[in-house]
Amino acid sequence: MRSYMQILQKFAKFIGPGILVSVAYMDPGNYATSVSGGAQYKYTLLFSIFISNIFAVLLQCLCVKLGTITGYDLAENCRHNLPKKLNYTLYLFAEVAIIATDLAEVVGTAIALQILFKIPLTWGVLLTVLDVLVILMFYTPNGQSLKKVRVFEFGVGILVIGTCICFVLELFKVSIPDKAELFKGFLPSNIIFKEQQALYISLGILGATVMPHSLYLGSSIVKPRLHDYDLKKYGKVNARPSLSAIKYTLNYAYAELIISLFLIATFVNSAILIVAGATLSGQPEAEDADLLSIYKLLVHYISPAAGLIFALAMLCSGQSAGIICTLAGQIVSEGFLQWSLPPWATRLCTRLIAIVPCLFVTLTMGEKGISDILNFSQVVLSLILPIVSAPLIYFTANRKLMVVHDENGVVRAPADVNAIADETTPLNSKHSKIVDFTNSRLLTYTSVFVWALIGSLNCYLVISYLLGADIHF
């Protein structure tokens, strides 16, 4: 019993990074797709949400491994280990993905502010810059203390809990007579292959769930706890963590991530679809509803309170996702380019780049333009995901990167795959301990299969959309 308590106490120290990552999987960009799925196919497409989260867990675990073993996040590994031109190309795609993601957060927050506080969309868009100030105050990932990092994680966690509570309340407001039908929705169904619209919505759920910026985020936010361990044990922090720090953190980081994604991201996305399936099924106006229309539908078919709860959930998720996206923007810029700009400048630039197009659209096109820009952002993200995720699989399958050479507890391995060991490195020492964290062959094949599947399905979805198919992102 005591050993279980010790495990739980140690696990509690790792709670935080998984919650931050889960935010990327429950942003306002997911809502319209899930509502459309519930309205047209009731609970049948819950399986699509479940399998999308399985894919997300696989990719995010690779991120945890990469950041923990190498001491560098995905963007930094690209800079160290890829040709300069390829690195810059990947940076451009990553930056576009950050901006496209941020558009969805800005839109969701602005609409929520309009519903809750009657703030015009234009002012709502401008107010979204405030979440940058939160990051500026609390998040210092390269500092030598976990206190500010934990405060930041706690703050985002409050917003996540708020989102979850809102959807719990929504679930209590709907009636689900046939519980078996609901749980059956988490099992595979052939309707996805029989009806093209079901396939489109399933692909839309997949595209809206697995987000490019979460890969950079997930590989970076594991570093503070590694640094804290080495600082306390060895009195200094190296770029690459010690083997003992890796062993201390890796499995707990995996566990915290998996639990967070399933308890938070899967629950929220499923709850949206369940509420829609229970109340909006068979309603034609719900099949292609934007965020504001969803609010109006919930008010009409459930109650005004249900609509307000949805708006509050959208505000919490929009704010938390916006904070995380802005942080990911800093990770991308500093990792790929090693920017010398102060962190506040990087974060502010990332946020302003997303706000400017939203502001222009709201001023010129109003609510219709906001809906269009949200759809456009989801198309962009679907196309970019396979590009930015390919290096992740390459790095974690590369033995030159994932082998740790340990001597007296301190890692001294090449910083990049092209580095050459000299006579003083443990690579040539008969006494150095070698631990190989490279992906197994099965994991590599599985990762490549998932990558190819997501990439091909996303491309099919986007091409169908461009050809005029009725697709809901």
UniProtKB/Swiss-Prot annotation:
Where does this chain mainly localize? membrane
Q: Name one GO cellular component term.
A: fungal-type vacuole membrane
The role this protein plays is: Has a role in controlling the cellular iron ion levels. Mobilizes vacuolar stores of iron in conditions of low iron levels.
Name of this chain's protein: Iron transporter SMF3
Q: What membrane topology was assigned to this protein in its record? A: Multi-pass membrane protein
This chain's source organism reads: Saccharomyces cerevisiae (strain ATCC 204508 / S288c)
Asked if the Swiss-Prot or TrEMBL record annotates the protein with the keyword Transcription regulation, the reply is: no
Annotated PANTHER family: IRON TRANSPORTER SMF3, SOLUTE CARRIER PROTEIN FAMILY 11 MEMBER
Give the residues annotated as coiled coil: none
HAMAP family listed in its UniProt record? NRAMP
For biological process, the GO terms are: intracellular iron ion homeostasis; intracellular manganese ion homeostasis; iron ion transmembrane transport; iron ion transport; manganese ion transport
Q: Which UniProt keywords apply?
A: Endoplasmic reticulum, Glycoprotein, Ion transport, Iron, Iron transport, Membrane, Metal-binding, Transmembrane, Transmembrane helix, Transport, Vacuole
Glycosylation sites noted in the Swiss-Prot or TrEMBL record: N87
Q: Which GO terms describe its molecular function?
A: cadmium ion transmembrane transporter activity; inorganic cation transmembrane transporter activity; manganese ion transmembrane transporter activity; metal ion binding
From the UniProt record, report the name of the gene that encodes this protein: SMF3
Q: Which InterPro entries match?
A: NRAMP_fam (IPR001046)
Give the superkingdom in one word.
Eukaryota
The entry sums up its family as follows:
Belongs to the NRAMP family.
Cell compartments where the protein resides: Vacuole membrane; Endoplasmic reticulum membrane
Please list every transmembrane segment annotated in the UniProt record, as residue ranges.
Answer: 14-34, 44-64, 97-117, 119-139, 152-172, 198-218, 257-277, 297-317, 352-372, 373-393, 448-468
